[in-house]
Amino acid sequence: MSVRCGIGYDLHRLAEGRKLIIGGIEIPFDKGPVGHSDGDVVAHALCDALLGAAGLGDIGTHFPDTDPKWKGANSLLFLEHARKLLDEKHFVIEHVDAVVILERPKLGPHFPKMREALAKSLRLPPEKIHLKAKTNEGVDAVGRGEAIAAQVVATLSL
């Protein structure tokens, strides 16, 4: 058995009047990410982590922001596509560990639904997905509430 790890990162500016989609679910808030798709930083970073671990490129290769068909797209579609590519190469997703970095809102109460949405898209048991949230304690664009970021590590076996 071969084990591979991939790392993903994503960051989006936040703007008023946009939906806040994180981990595949909408979270009530007055701001949301500015992006070509729905701006789901967890799904984007997770997609990059999975593709990177498998040596299959990155989210921009598969879903370029220059392609109008991805405008406003649900980022869970990106995860479903990544899962199909992994299946074709016989990779197994062993574990996903994600951290979302934002000042507000508090995400802990939303983790169960986020985990369910991500697990469903990847066809995984929810216990293979771990989520955490951190703040930047007022430092930089994330700390000032101007942006949201996520970092994800994915472990695959072959």
Residue ranges and their predicted role:
Residues 125-128:
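Short acidic capping loops at alpha-helix termini that bridge into adjacent secondary structure
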Residues 109-110, 140, 144:
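Acidic (Asp/Glu) carboxylate-rich active-site/surface patches
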Residues 6-8, 137-140:
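Glycine-rich, charged/polar anion/phosphate-binding loops
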Residues 30-31, 139-141:
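A generic structural signal for short coil/turn motifs at secondary-structure boundaries
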Residues 142-158:
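C-terminal edge-of-domain segments
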Residues 1-3, 157-158:
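N-terminal charge/polar-biased segments
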Residues 2-113, 117, 122:
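RNase III-family endoribonuclease catalytic core
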Residues 131-135:
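Pyridoxal 5′-phosphate
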